[in-house]
Amino acid sequence: MIEDNKENKDHAPERGRTAIIFSLKNEVGGLVKALKLFQEKHVNLVHIESRKSKRRNSEFEIFVDCDSNREQLNEIFQLLKSHVSIVSMNPTEHFNVQEDGDMENIPWYPKKISDLDKCANRVLMYGSDLDADHPGFKDNVYRKRRKYFADLAMNYKHGDPIPEIEFTEEEIKTWGTVYRELNKLYPTHACREYLKNLPLLTKYCGYREDNIPQLEDVSRFLKERTGFTIRPVAGYLSPRDFLAGLAFRVFHCTQYVRHSSDPLYTPEPDTCHELLGHVPLLAEPSFAQFSQEIGLASLGASDEAVQKLATCYFFTVEFGLCKQEGQLRVYGAGLLSSISELKHSLSGSAKVKPFDPKVTCKQECLITTFQEVYFVSESFEEAKEKMREFAKTIKRPFGVKYNPYTQSVQILKDTKSIASVVNELRHELDIVSDALSKMGKQLEV
């Protein structure tokens, strides 16, 4: 069982839970050395987990959930910076104790949409903290600008309007280069759903070569189309936190623009990737449903199950292919926002396999190079059905159902909760039956 360390609580009123995430090279003894620093400063570690870095294939990211006071944390933060390559520190309520006996080891997950405030700021990098190989690492003006965007995202709360950004000429020029080059490829590479929705975004959200759309405008557009909304985020989230947002039809979206020195490359998701890669398909009902179901399957799932779901998400929503009119077309956002890999994926030289979650979840995700294999689905509906079957294999002592009226998840774990859902379905079937009856009378059937 995971629980807060309550010892000496009266003598340390400023103690609290904080998440620290840092990167380690894949070498013997690295983790032991880092954890020894926590021991020396008497920092209690409540939870530890590791995952392969999304930025460097040779490194691992370590997440630790700490219970300590601010002075101890500041000391450990400074010590870690001299031993590891990336350090991020944020308040956390990521894990907690569940009261039901069969739920006590279930990781914390948001129950209502406002709970995303508790995990949306758990970014792996913050503001001006860039890797040494980042194109903007030596550009102090760019780093300052990145911190500005990060602060906006970190201060955002559910229900707030997304702040309007006055983009610089340099940022608009960078966006324009990406927009112009990608639009040359979309007619022959993008799926029909993407091509249908892109003109709507031009009309209603200001998608143009000389204009970067505002996230608030995009969020309102998506809300009317599929119920999805946009939430600004400062950078990478953990797979668990990102997928949790999808369960509530919330897409965490960056606002910063990639560095102008190399407009056709970015080592991380930026607003070009989000707006040109993801948004057009989030405006498609079937795709939106597919994305939400992956998110719902992740709630309360084990770390292993979440990683499998995240990998399936990566090879579908980010790098997925589909068949249309007998030809391969792209629907993955990572491809639709990358000129070189978009060309490669349909070049004939790329390796392609049918999408099968049981196989796909074992494939390695590559960040800095082209994928070794791409997975193709016959349709979004087929991909959705396969993911539904795969989700049934995830061991979880309850089911979940999203309630769009309260923007919360219903926990289905007893006959009472199941009966409530059955009553809702019965009412909806009555509506359908009544409509069919009226249609029959009109047709004199």
UniProtKB/Swiss-Prot annotation:
Gene Ontology terms for molecular function: iron ion binding; tryptophan 5-monooxygenase activity
Pathway, per record: Aromatic compound metabolism; serotonin biosynthesis; serotonin from L-tryptophan: step 1/2
GO biological-process terms attached to the record: aromatic amino acid metabolic process; platelet degranulation; regulation of hemostasis; serotonin biosynthetic process
EC supergroup of this enzyme: oxidoreductase
Physiological role: Oxidizes L-tryptophan to 5-hydroxy-l-tryptophan in the rate-determining step of serotonin biosynthesis.
Subunit structure: Homotetramer.
Keywords: Iron, Metal-binding, Monooxygenase, Oxidoreductase, Phosphoprotein, Serotonin biosynthesis
Chain ranges of the ACT domain: 19-94
Residue numbers of Phosphoserine PTMs: 58
UniProt catalytic activity: (6R)-L-erythro-5,6,7,8-tetrahydrobiopterin + L-tryptophan + O2 = 5-hydroxy-L-tryptophan + (4aS,6R)-4a-hydroxy-L-erythro-5,6,7,8-tetrahydrobiopterin
Enzyme Commission identifier(s): 1.14.16.4
Protein name, per record: Tryptophan 5-hydroxylase 1
Cofactor(s) listed: Fe(2+)
InterPro entries linked: ACT-like_dom_sf, ACT_dom, ArAA_hydroxylase, ArAA_hydroxylase_Fe/CU_BS, ArAA_hydroxylase_sf, Aro-AA_hydroxylase_C_sf, Aromatic-AA_hydroxylase_C, Trp_5_mOase
Binding site for Fe cation: 273, 278, 318
Family: Belongs to the biopterin-dependent aromatic amino acid hydroxylase family.
Residues given in the record as L-tryptophan binding sites: 236, 258, 266, 337, 367
Top-level lineage group: Eukaryota
GO cellular component terms attached to this protein's record: neuron projection
Lineage, top ranks: Eukaryota, Metazoa, Chordata, Craniata, Vertebrata
Gene this chain is encoded by: TPH1
